[in-house]
């Protein structure tokens, strides 16, 4: 049996550790992914229904008065089982899947991405004309290099009005140097 001490303020708390707790610690440090080890196979994976807490009052730090209060928090079975038993995803039946037409799904996707179509032409029955019109505008709305929702920056297409050419000046003489004269000499 080994001892350890914990100093809180001016009082010291001494605790004895038995061999049983050492075995628990060795089980906790064991590799859970090593199935050859017999100790890890004996670990149970049941959900905890109780959490035990030992409370030590500041007045009970002496060894003589070893009255530790045991607090037990019981988890409600209803809340615990409801969380584990409830399905996470509701599945769509084949009947519900077949009820949604693909055309409406695609239009909904485009509307979600900010695509605006002429609702007046769609209601008249000229769907083919409006779709052809929308497809022809794709190259204007989405130039190369931009994503679906990206907006074209107007400053990119504007050419600068002023042009300043690069002039080479000889450091020694301080005169302008033409490329033709420098290459000939």
Swiss-Prot record:
Compartment(s) where it occurs, according to its Swiss-Prot or TrEMBL record: Cytoplasm; Nucleus
Region (Disordered), start-end ranges: 112-143
GO cellular-component term (any): Prp19 complex
Gene Ontology BP, a term: mRNA splicing, via spliceosome
Top-level taxon of origin: Eukaryota
Alphabetic keyword roster: Cytoplasm, mRNA processing, mRNA splicing, Nucleus, Spliceosome
Sequence intervals crossing the membrane: none
UniProt xrefs under Pfam families: G-patch_2
Any one Gene Ontology molecular-function term assigned to this protein's record: nucleic acid binding
Keyword NAD among record annotations: no
Effect the entry attributes to changing residue 109 to E/R: Loss of the interaction with PRP2
Assembly and oligomerization: Belongs to the CWC complex (or CEF1-associated complex), a spliceosome sub-complex reminiscent of a late-stage spliceosome composed of the U2, U5 and U6 snRNAs and at least BUD13, BUD31, BRR2, CDC40, CEF1, CLF1, CUS1, CWC2, CWC15, CWC21, CWC22, CWC23, CWC24, CWC25, CWC27, ECM2, HSH155, IST3, ISY1, LEA1, MSL1, NTC20, PRP8, PRP9, PRP11, PRP19, PRP21, PRP22, PRP45, PRP46, SLU7, SMB1, SMD1, SMD2, SMD3, SMX2, SMX3, SNT309, SNU114, SPP2, SYF1, SYF2, RSE1 and YJU2. Interacts with PRP2.
Summary of the function given for this chain in its UniProt record: Involved in pre-mRNA splicing; specifically in the final stages of spliceosome maturation. Promotes the first step of splicing.
Similarity comment text for this entry: Belongs to the SPP2 family.
Protein's UniProt name: Pre-mRNA-splicing factor SPP2
Source lineage: Eukaryota, Fungi, Dikarya, Ascomycota, Saccharomycotina
